[in-house]
């Protein structure tokens, strides 16, 4: 068997195991994703660059360079990289804008705040497309919020408002790679479900 067929078989088994366990929501195991950002490398105006370690772990991601001001393909980037066998009760995990901006570069947006907001707009288009196709829960992966000692929660909140305002799906902010005990109050005030 080749790698693609093995990956597909494992994906189907993972999805089947979740269904058989009667989980409330089922997710794609993302076995075809090299990292949580990689599908976005296919956007126009985005160039994959060097490999980098994520937060001093032995996990790597490809740094993306956003070379223009408009980076979207109409909201099909994430959806086209997910397995089509997901049931109706499906969920998806994607990076939130602050983490995205922390780990990537932009030639157009020199201020990180502007980059975060524009990434939020791009992600909202992606999320709207996912919700239209039946995704009920959107998990926003936020390791930078946990890892960084200082976080501009005003910018994080503004970006999350772009993503969540009027959204017809639940949103979960998933923090990891750090202790958030000193940030709890700020986290509880963020506009997520």
Q: Where is each model-derived feature located?
A:
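Domain-level signal for soluble alpha/beta catalytic cores
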Residues: 1-193
């Amino acid at each position: 068997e080749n790698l693609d067929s093995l990956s597909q078989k494992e994906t189907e088994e993972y999805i089947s195991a979740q269904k058989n366990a009667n989980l409330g929501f089922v997710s794609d195991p993302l076995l075809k994703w090299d990292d949580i950002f990689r599908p976005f490398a296919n956007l126009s105006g985005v160039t994959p660059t060097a490999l980098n370690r994520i937060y001093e772990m032995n996990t790597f991601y490809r740094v993306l360079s956003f070379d223009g001001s408009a980076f979207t393909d109409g909201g099909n980037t994430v959806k086209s990289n997910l397995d089509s066998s997901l049931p109706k009760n499906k969920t998806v995990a994607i990076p939130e804008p602050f983490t995205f901006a922390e780990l990537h570069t932009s030639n157009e947006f020199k201020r990180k705040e502007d980059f975060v907001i524009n990434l939020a707009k791009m992600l909202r288009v992606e999320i709207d497309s996912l919700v239209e196709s039946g995704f009920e829960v959107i998990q926003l992966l936020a390791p930078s919020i946990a890892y960084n000692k200082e976080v501009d929660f005003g910018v994080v909140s503004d970006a999350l408002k772009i993503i969540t305002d009027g959204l017809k799906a639940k949103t979960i902010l998933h923090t990891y790679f750090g202790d958030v005990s000193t940030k709890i109050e700020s986290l509880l005030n963020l506009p997520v479900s």
